[in-house]
């Protein structure tokens, strides 16, 4: 979920000044534009506005199928849930009338909401400034983010039916045909079926095992406890103070209801062995704040088998093997092993 940012200073158009006045007081004197759009169907512009008094505020101008008033209000409420636990998250604002303006902007019909300008830098900015190494630093905050997330899980928030961007067995937005896990698995199957014929029996065996596991998981998954999460813990969203301490998160546009175990497993990804250790570490941290139910313990291994063995990185590994028969066999054998192995997660949840 890394963002491709395009940042530049921009002249303040009179229309933007008028839009700003719908949310805030003060006279805008400068603006910084950050473009985090992802193609024609997901337009996102952030304007950081500075007033003549030196105050900074944020306008978000968005056109996609998952940003609409009801969802923004849900983000707004979830921000307050995080703040209630002592974590810093910039507040999200309606306009002065209590709504969210819809405007024509860059040839698109866009909704607009506002945010408090963050008093803390994201980890990615501190790394870019040469203060530390981003990848290493993200690992340094592992306990912080899973302590925080477990506390949110323990609240069992139920104020929304909108799923998070990590949702399983349902879709995040109308343009999604299937959930991301199934999308990745189908992409794996498509490529695996193009392998030389001598591998196709194993490919079919893997697919049958994966499909049977997913179908069995589906029935029990709907009964697992849920809460509401920010759902995007990459370094661009982790807020760090000047002393290097973790303070909170921002960017709630993937926020929503989710099963905590799904969220935890989806946020921890690497090669098989490292990935399992990351999940176990996160579970160990989480259980200090969250009591895993017997249903969650029983679902942990089937959930892992559903999410991880056919993740998009496994397609990449197969493609990297090219025409090397030994390399292909190695990839398939590892997938089949981790799809069927009796991996212990329960002892890390007790």
Predicted regions located by residue number:
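ATP/Mg2+ or Mg2+-diphosphate-binding catalytic cores
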Residues: 311-350
């Amino acid at each position: 979920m890394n963002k491709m940012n395009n940042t530049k200073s921009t002249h303040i158009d009179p229309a933007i000044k008028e839009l700003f006045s719908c949310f805030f007081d003060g006279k805008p004197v400068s603006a910084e534009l950050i473009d985090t759009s992802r193609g024609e169907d997901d337009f996102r512009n952030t304007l950081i506005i500075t007033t003549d008094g030196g105050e900074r505020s944020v306008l978000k101008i968005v056109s996609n199928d998952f940003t609409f008033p009801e969802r923004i209000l849900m983000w707004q409420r979830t921000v307050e849930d995080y703040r209630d636990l002592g974590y810093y998250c910039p507040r999200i604002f309606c306009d002065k009338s209590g709504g969210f303006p819809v405007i024509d902007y860059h040839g698109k019909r866009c909704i607009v909401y506002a945010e408090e300008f963050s008093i803390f830098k994201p980890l990615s900015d501190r790394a870019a400034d040469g203060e530390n190494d981003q990848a290493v630093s993200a690992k340094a905050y592992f306990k912080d983010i899973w302590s925080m997330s477990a506390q949110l899980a323990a609240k069992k928030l139920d104020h929304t039916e909108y799923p998070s961007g990590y949702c399983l067995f349902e879709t995040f937005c109308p343009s999604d045909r299937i959930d991301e896990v199934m999308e990745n698995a189908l992409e794996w199957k498509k490529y695996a079926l193009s392998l030389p014929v001598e591998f196709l029996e194993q490919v079919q065996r893997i697919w049958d095992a994966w499909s049977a596991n997913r179908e069995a998981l589906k029935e029990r998954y709907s009964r697992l406890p849920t809460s509401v999460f920010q759902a995007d813990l990459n370094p661009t969203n982790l807020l760090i103070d000047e002393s290097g301490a973790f303070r909170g998160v921002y960017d709630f546009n993937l926020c929503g209801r989710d099963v905590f175990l799904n969220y935890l497993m989806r946020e921890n990804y690497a090669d098989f062995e490292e990935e399992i250790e990351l999940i176990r570490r996160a579970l160990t941290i989480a259980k200090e704040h969250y009591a895993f139910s017997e249903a969650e313990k029983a679902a942990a291994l089937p959930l892992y088998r559903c999410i991880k063995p056919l993740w998009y990185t496994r397609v990449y590994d197969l493609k990297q093997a090219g025409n090397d028969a030994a390399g292909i066999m190695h990839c398939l054998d590892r997938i089949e092993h981790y799809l069927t192995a009796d991996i212990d997660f329960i002892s890390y949840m007790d």
